């Protein structure tokens, strides 16, 4: 059985394993107050060219989104997101459970359009009853999106301008950020994200780490007592060094970007194979997530040897499935998948 089910099936990159083994019995102070976390933060600041950034390490994506959004928003505020955004669809109501409404907008290939955001905000404040409504207090996007698509630099700049006009933060979910930045023809860099986004996080769980996400507040805008708020959300890891060592390793010698490229290269080969086999793509994703419509009978046969991820039904006899590559995907497994297809 080979797996293309997701990009978090493997453990961690070998260099992370080596570093963790080295420090395993060192006796390191807790809660992220250690030299490894500080070193990782400084390396991330350098990668973002954002020396004033405040950085915090959390364990997982949904936990990070809930903690950040709940800590930044007032009790009467909600967060604008695409109807297909992770916070709106695959986080089990985590944002709503913390008391905030997800204000959904239509998506185009997984992305919210700057014009739609501007129109929503304009209409909200033009409504004479808006004091009786949930205020839009943040714009949430992910890069890559749920469909593996990417924002352009121009789109990020537009969204940033709109958010500044209405004095609300632009928050970018970077669970798969490395894979988005590794695409050859993208015009978005880590520096651009730090420039245009008020808050973003760098995903480790899906990009080479055992677990961990690095939250970056780019404009000295972290909520007061944010560590306390992290703790309040049950998200503060006592062994914080475990995350610090991993991110310190990922941001040494450009390892984060080097291993991200493997996911893009193996995904490109997989797309070639799928095209050769005559499969229809549900959406044109340039990153490591590939969405294909398959006949249910063919899918049933494929799943005897390959794990893939269910996405949605298109009709009674067809299903959209997702193939995901990662930093750890072996090209030989891609070729083997081609035999099963």
Describe the role of every protein-language-model region.
Residues 13-60, 83-88, 94:
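Conserved N-terminal alpha-helix of the aminotransferase class I/II PLP-enzyme fold
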Residues 71-89, 118:
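Conserved PLP-anchoring active-site segment centered on the Schiff-base-forming lysine
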Residues 74-76, 268, 275-341:
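Conserved C-terminal alpha-helix-loop-beta "cap" of PLP-dependent enzymes
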Residues 99-137, 141-144, 151-158:
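PLP-dependent aminotransferase-class I/II
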Residues 102-103, 170-172, 281, 308-310:
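Hydrophobic beta-strand scaffold residues
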Residues 108-109, 135-136, 142, 150, ...:
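Active-site C-terminal subdomain of aminotransferase-like
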Residues 151-183:
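Catalytic PLP-binding core of fold-type I/II PLP enzymes
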